[in-house]
A protein has these predicted regions:
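C-terminal flanking tails of non-heme Fe-dependent oxygenases
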Residues: 4-194
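Redox-cofactor-proximal catalytic regions of oxidoreductases
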Residues: 1
Length: 194
């Protein structure tokens, strides 16, 4: 055990949650809703901090070897701190994969599926993937900003109209996350052929 590690990570978690709250306030301003809308929905958040290691590719011809296949994140927003190895790609509005190179002192901010539901796709989830770097280990520290488990996820005020009705049924944070996990890991429940 590293001396002071737990204290350091607990503080980092709190700092990341505070940064997430600041970004969520900016979203409320952009959407024209009450500025403290998210505050009461993030009193006991289920946000997650992960540490991810991506092993290196060993040959230039294994470019299709991915550290993480194309996906969107489940929650509200994701704050990603990358190391200098690179490998993160995002899909642009034309469907092209573009590099999201690490920039020292910055975070990548991805919109997640829960925010897309809340905003009725005014904010859309960010499709992304990781291509393992050639000959270099890659490390990242994503922070998944998630509300209280019982928070109702439904179309925000002003994000729907007669001509643009709500695209998604109402749910709760817990119900939505559990359904996404169940879909993602369905293969683990399927009987294995012998």
């Amino acid at each position: 055990e590293l001396d002071g590690w737990q204290t350091l990570m607990e503080q980092h978690y709190l700092d990341m949650q505070a940064l997430g709250q600041t970004l969520l306030q900016a979203i409320t301003v952009a959407l024209g809703i009450e500025r403290d809308f998210f505050d009461k929905r993030f009193i006991e958040p289920v946000s997650v901090l992960r540490f991810i290691h991506y092993p290196p590719r060993h040959t230039a011809t294994s470019a299709e070897q991915q550290g993480a296949g194309a996906h969107t994140d489940y929650g509200c927003i994701t704050l990603l701190h990358q190391d200098s190895a690179g490998g993160l790609q995002v899909r642009d509005v034309r469907g092209q994969w573009i590099d999201a190179p690490p920039i020292e002192g910055t975070f990548v901010v991805n919109i997640g599926d829960m925010m897309a539901r809340w905003s009725n796709d005014r904010y859309v989830s960010t499709p992304h993937r990781v291509i393992s770097p050639l000959g270099v280990d890659r490390y990242s520290m994503p922070f998944f900003v998630e509300p209280n488990p019982d928070t109702r996820i439904e179309c925000l005020p002003g994000c729907q109209s007669e001509s643009q009705p709500a695209l998604y049924p109402a749910t709760t944070c817990a119900e939505f996350l559990l359904s996404r996990f169940a879909d993602t890991y369905a293969y683990r429940r399927e009987p294995q052929a012998s």
